[in-house]
Curated annotation (Swiss-Prot):
GO cellular component: cytosol
Taxonomic placement: Bacteria, Pseudomonadati, Pseudomonadota, Gammaproteobacteria, Moraxellales
Name of this protein: Aspartate carbamoyltransferase catalytic subunit
GO biological process: 'de novo' pyrimidine nucleobase biosynthetic process; 'de novo' UMP biosynthetic process; amino acid metabolic process
Binding site for carbamoyl phosphate: R72, T73, R122, H152, Q155, G282, P283
EC number in record: 2.1.3.2
Keyword Repressor: no
Gene3D superfamilies: Aspartate/ornithine carbamoyltransferase
Catalyzed reaction equations: carbamoyl phosphate + L-aspartate = N-carbamoyl-L-aspartate + phosphate + H(+)
Key words, A-Z: Pyrimidine biosynthesis, Transferase
Cited function: Catalyzes the condensation of carbamoyl phosphate and aspartate to form carbamoyl aspartate and inorganic phosphate, the committed step in the de novo pyrimidine nucleotide biosynthesis pathway.
Gene name per UniProt: pyrB
Similarity field: Belongs to the aspartate/ornithine carbamoyltransferase superfamily. ATCase family.
């Protein structure tokens, strides 16, 4: 999906040229499998769900289900790392030296001096994790903790785990409605890609036109104009947060008008299937994106999404560690 986000403050000019916003998503989605996988198909870096096939996504879910009984705390990579005994460095580049003008490559070289096996990277520039995976030394693996508008693959996979565990029907039989700020949401991109890979054929999206990427129909989703029609007979209703911090100018008339047109209300939930799941990646804007009675209601699995996050992150860390060992064995 096109990305017009200005990322020049986060990478050097030469690096930025490699990630032209007009082509970033198409280019990344067609190339992610190359640095992401070893020759045997094991995961070398976890950069996005787009580069993985159905069996590989199912393997992540299966690994997460193995870890699930021990996950009772809030979703953080730190919890997962401690339970696995992994030597992991968590990086929020936006709050590091990049703010002072240091290039992404220089940041990476400095970080490599710290003895860590895996870097979990969050960056405001689309493609940053992909860039680091191509530049990092062979003994370090990269996990994408969210890059710009491009992808949030661990959130996407914890959403798939939640649907797998809670939905009464298999992926192939589900209708999923995604509501809200798709344009600025890396979660939406990862969810749409994962849902399609796992066999969901009916993916619906609705938002004000200002919050939809241009040409979104090309990505195999149905765009709706009417909220009631969008959620009717759905199995999963997924709200998205309005990304105010990524919106350069006002794109909404008002919060109250947005809620009136696109809010997930009890009346609209009643139009979906009786056992429909209510999801949201958080944080929620109650009374804008979703009614409190829905967020806290019996069909909501929002807190289960949170608790499933630890299992997914443990699964991703474990599979990445296995892939890293395989990569090192092949080199040796």
């Amino acid at each position: 999906m096109p990305n017009t986000h200005d990322t020049k403050n986060n990478v050097s000019p030469s690096e930025y040229a490699k990630f032209d916003p007009s082509t970033i998503h198409q280019r990344l989605n067609t190339s992610l499998s190359r640095p992401q996988l070893n020759s045997d198909g094991s995961i070398r870096h976890f950069l996005g769900v787009e580069g993985l096939n159905k069996a590989q996504l199912q393997a992540i879910i299966a690994k997460a289900l193995f870890f699930e009984p021990s996950t009772r705390t809030r979703t953080t990579f730190e919890v997962a790392e401690k339970r696995l005994g992994a030597n992991v460095l968590n990086l929020d580049i936006a709050s590091s030296s990049a703010k002072k003008g240091e290039s992404l490559r220089d940041t990476l070289w400095n970080l490599q001096a710290m003895t860590a096996d895996i870097f979990v990277v969050r960056h405001s520039a689309s493609g940053a994790a992909h860039f680091m995976a191509t530049e990092v030394t062979p003994d370090i693996a990269i996990i994408n903790g969210g890059d710009g508008w491009h992808a949030h693959p661990t959130q996407g996979m914890l959403d798939m785990l939640t649907i797998h565990r809670e939905a009464p029907r298999p992926f192939e039989e589900l209708s999923v409605a995604i509501i809200g700020d798709v344009k600025h949401s890396r979660v939406a991109r990862s969810d749409i890609s994962a849902l399609q890979t796992l066999g969901v054929k009916d993916i619906r999206v609705i938002a004000p036109r200002t919050l939809l990427p241009k040409g979104i129909e090309r990505f195999g989703v149905q765009v709706y104009e009417d909220m009631n029609s969008c959620v009717r007979d759905c199995d999963v209703i997924m709200g998205l947060r309005i990304q105010n911090e990524r919106i350069g100018s006002p794109l909404l008339a008002s919060s109250s008008e947005y809620y009136k047109q696109y809010g997930i209300t009890p009346e609209r939930v009643a139009l979906a299937k009786p056992d429909a799941l209510i999801m949201h990646p958080g944080p929620m804007n109650r009374g804008v994106e979703i009614a409190s009675s829905v967020a806290d209601g019996p069909q909501s699995v929002i807190l289960k999404q949170v608790s499933n996050g630890v299992a997914i992150r443990m699964a991703v860390l474990a599979l990445t560690m296995e892939g890293q060992r395989a990569h090192q064995a092949n080199r040796g």
